[in-house]
């Protein structure tokens, strides 16, 4: 049934003689199915003539579209005739099923034609070619499967062997029941061939196989053993099983083995030729599929996707990549001046800053084919696949030129090639990189394929990849500035239902999140919306944004983690020490919030400072940062005369600042104005240092002096303000969370003047105006979060 269905759906008839198709015009060809007058087609007398003729006519007319080749027409006719004589109802079901599949495919083609309406002519032509390639591939697959199915069916039909049996099965299931007709002994193979009577019943079922093989240990005494078994079964002499011997020589066995091997190789060659393993275009073989580049095609002409106006911030980066778009749209402006557009651009920057987003915008704006592929998709465990995929990618790009090729995370294939010094190498990655270098700037390079790549690890890229002529333009996308963060916040806030306008929140949130990437900002906006929905608010409030910022910075409050009274007291004095030192010193940031609620990031409490967009730091500013970080440890020592492990992260920060001041910033008098790069660990954790062991000891000594000086200064600040430290700790134990206004009410204003806080004047004026006018917020516009009124920003 399956073979016949494949025959009907996959093959087409060519010219040449052959048996007449069974449904063609002519005389009736089978009993029980008289021919309908004037048509010569069979019909079933048990069904209504009108309905049957109409349905059968449609089915047979559809089947005529799938005409058979001369090679298999005779086989198909024989199968159909046998099937018809044995079970005509099943034949009708088969024809009806084939008609259903054919009409279903016709409907699917009509749907595809309807979908293609309204598309551009280029898109419709491209879609047509793609469908033709797919249809050709499917036809080749069906032909291959058909050949395999027919060969296996014929071999199975011609073979009468039922497999191997044991001596016990032979005696009890065949010999004792009288099913054995004769046996034939093959001495060279120690095999006995057992031939059964037609229609023999073996193991309780009728068997079509009439020959079984039996392995015998002592072939010379087989006949004697057989006669003894017949005597035990009381078989008469006239009914004894005849035994014959078949001897094959060495050359006969060799010829048989060579012939079977040749037949198998011929079948494999034929299958591989049909499948395209010989390199023919359009092949569907597994190896060809592995060699093909798995890129994503972005069509900017569809009008969908990300445009430059959707990318907030990154003004300089957008200006640089826009030149590629302008060149592809109107190259004559550049060519008439003799200018050459760069061959490629490398987008650099920290994670989450929008490198891939900018590439998506280029894909939409360029209005040319955009082939995107990730770097890790080039490398596989099979050698040579990476280079093959690079060739496949650029071959497709040159066919679609002008075109843009985008490789995301290019560091996966663009790492520096190994040298003889290292002793380690990855040949597959190096071959992939070499092929990429040749395709980007080699003998067959064209000027109409532009390469964009992105990575956040430019330091490990190979120098040949970074040189002019390949990735000759390096676009650095840094963390967004204050203005860029405000634009990014406004872009993400547009999709949220806010209590106020998006510009009402964007400025404060931008000032509250220095050092945040675009991905972090998107995460904050999403967390605020999720929190508002979880709390049942009808719009996103200020408290929701504060919760989102706090969650990103310190994690979610872990209320299930209950601290003992002693631990709560230690944490309260620890965080109060940080807050008090930061409050009393001049060059430290303002304390926004102090909490002793445990967090999911393993922190038992935190003091949230207001960070600043600052790129230059003086020695005094760095020193006071060290003092503020040591405030928790010093507060524990003064309050309890012992220290805990809670200051581990603080000590790590202090150590990093101290060594940076000594080794990189040249701020240690004993070392002088010299700078060394950060330590780079090599193989086995061993790094090469550009300074001597003696200088290392001097730098260690200077760093220890800085840390000791900062700790003494911190202790002095806390000792002079023990009452304020106690007041802050008691307030934390009572409320668990205090903010800027609470601290100012407890210990007074900062001694060096008010700290810089985020309080836009329009926010304060809006709050005062609402209080003066006595406005009442309705539930539809503003629902009080967490059962209370929405708090104002700290002043």
Curated annotation (Swiss-Prot):
Q: Which organism is it from?
A: Homo sapiens
> Which gene codes for it?
SPG7
* An example Gene Ontology CC term for this record: m-AAA complex
Q: Which Pfam families does its entry note?
A: AAA, AAA_lid_3, FtsH_ext, Peptidase_M41
Q: What is this protein called?
A: Mitochondrial inner membrane m-AAA protease component paraplegin
Question: What tissue specificity is annotated for this entry?
Answer: Ubiquitous.
Q: Where is the transit peptide?
A: 1-43
Q: List residues modified as 3'-nitrotyrosine.
A: 505
- Residue ranges in the Mitochondrial matrix topological domain are 106-144, 270-795
Q: How is it modified after translation?
A: Upon import into the mitochondrion, the N-terminal transit peptide is cleaved by the mitochondrial-processing peptidase (MPP) to generate an intermediate form which undergoes a second proteolytic cleavage mediated by proteases AFG3L2 removing an additional N-terminal fragment to generate the proteolytically active mature form.
Q: How is the cofactor bound?
A: Binds 1 zinc ion per subunit.
Family (UniProt): In the N-terminal section; belongs to the AAA ATPase family.
Write out the residues that bind ATP.
Answer: 312, 352-357
Tell me the organism's taxonomic lineage. Answer: Eukaryota, Metazoa, Chordata, Craniata, Vertebrata
């Amino acid at each position: 049934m399956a073979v016949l269905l494949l025959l009907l759906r996959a093959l087409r008839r060519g010219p040449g003689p052959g048996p007449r198709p069974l449904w063609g015009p002519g005389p009736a060809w089978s009993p029980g199915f008289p021919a309908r007058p004037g048509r010569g087609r069979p019909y079933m007398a048990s069904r209504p003539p009108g309905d049957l003729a109409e349905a059968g006519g449609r089915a047979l007319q559809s089947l005529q579209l799938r005409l058979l080749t001369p090679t298999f027409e005779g086989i198909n006719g024989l199968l159909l005739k046998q099937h018809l004589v044995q079970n005509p109802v099943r034949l009708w079901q088969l024809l009806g099923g084939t008609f259903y599949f054919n009409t279903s495919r016709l409907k699917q083609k009509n749907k595809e034609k309807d979908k293609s309406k309204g598309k551009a002519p280029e898109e419709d032509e491209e879609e047509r070619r793609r469908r033709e390639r797919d249809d050709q591939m499917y036809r080749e697959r069906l032909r291959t499967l058909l050949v395999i199915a027919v060969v296996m069916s014929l071999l199975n039909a011609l073979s009468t062997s039922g497999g191997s049996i044991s001596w016990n099965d032979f005696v009890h299931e065949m010999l004792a029941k009288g099913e054995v007709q004769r046996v034939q002994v093959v001495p060279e193979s120690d095999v006995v061939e057992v031939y059964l009577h037609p229609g023999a019943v073996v193991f309780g079922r009728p068997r079509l196989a009439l020959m079984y093989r039996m392995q015998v240990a002592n072939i010379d005494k087989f006949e004697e053993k057989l006669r003894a078994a017949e005597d035990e079964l009381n078989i008469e002499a006239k009914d004894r099983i005849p035994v014959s011997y078949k001897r094959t020589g060495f050359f006969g066995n060799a010829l048989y083995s060579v012939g079977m091997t040749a037949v198998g190789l011929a079948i494999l060659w034929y299958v591989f030729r049909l499948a395209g393993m010989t390199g023919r275009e359009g092949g569907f073989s597994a190896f060809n599929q592995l060699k093909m580049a798995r890129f994503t095609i972005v069509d900017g002409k569809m009008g969908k996707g990300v445009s430059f106006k959707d990318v907030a911030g990154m003004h300089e980066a957008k200006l640089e990549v826009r030149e590629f778009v302008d060149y592809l749209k109107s190259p004559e402006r550049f060519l008439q001046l003799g200018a050459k557009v760069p061959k490629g651009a490398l987008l650099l920057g920290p994670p989450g800053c929008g490198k891939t987003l900018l590439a998506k915008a280029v894909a939409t704006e360029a209005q040319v084919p955009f082939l995107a592929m990730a770097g890790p998709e080039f490398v596989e465990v099979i050698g040579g696949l990476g280079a093959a995929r690079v060739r496949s990618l650029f071959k497709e790009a040159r066919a679609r030129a002008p075109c843009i090729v985008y490789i995301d995370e290019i560091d996966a294939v663009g790492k520096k090639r190994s040298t003889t010094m290292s002793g380690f190498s990855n040949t597959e990655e190096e071959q992939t990189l070499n092929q990429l270098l040749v395709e980007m700037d080699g003998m067959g390079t064209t000027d109409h394929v532009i390469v964009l790549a992105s990575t956040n690890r430019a330091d490990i890229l190979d120098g040949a990849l970074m040189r002019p002529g390949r990735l000759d333009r390096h676009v650095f996308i840094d963390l967004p500035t204050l203005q860029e963060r405000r634009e990014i916040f406004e872009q993400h806030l547009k999709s949220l239902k806010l209590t106020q306008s998006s510009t009402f929140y964007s400025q404060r949130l931008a000032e509250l999140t220095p050092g945040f990437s675009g991905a972090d900002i998107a995460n904050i906006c999403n967390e605020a919306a999720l929190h508002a929905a979880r709390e049942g608010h009808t719009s996103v409030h200020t408290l929701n944004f504060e919760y989102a910022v706090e969650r990103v910075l310190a994690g979610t409050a872990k209320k299930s983690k209950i601290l003992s009274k002693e631990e709560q007291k230690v944490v309260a004095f620890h965080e109060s020490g940080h807050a008090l030192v930061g409050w009393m010193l001049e060059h430290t940031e303002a304390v926004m919030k102090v909490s002793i609620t445990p967090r999911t990031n393993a922190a038992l409490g935190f003091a949230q400072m207001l960070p600043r967009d600052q790129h230059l730091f003086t020695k005094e500013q760095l020193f006071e940062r060290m003092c503020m970080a040591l405030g928790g440890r010093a507060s524990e020592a003064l309050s309890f005369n012992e220290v805990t492990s809670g200051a581990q992260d603080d000590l790590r920060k202090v150590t990093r600042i101290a060594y940076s001041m000594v080794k990189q910033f040249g701020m240690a008098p004993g070392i002088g104005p010299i700078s060394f790069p950060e330590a780079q660990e090599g193989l086995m954790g061993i790094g090469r240092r550009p300074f001597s062991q003696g200088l290392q000891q001097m730098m260690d000594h200077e760093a220890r002096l800085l840390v000791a000086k900062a700790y003494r200064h911190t202790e002095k600040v806390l000792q002079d303000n023990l009452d304020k430290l106690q007041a802050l700790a008691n307030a934390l134990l009572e409320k668990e969370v205090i903010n800027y206004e609470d601290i100012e009410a407890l210990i007074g204003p900062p001694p060096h003047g008010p700290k810089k806080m985020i309080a836009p004047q329009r926010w304060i004026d809006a709050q005062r105006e609402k209080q003066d006018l006595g406005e009442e917020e309705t539930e539809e516009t503003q629902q009080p979060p967490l059962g209370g009124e929405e708090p104002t920003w700290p002043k």
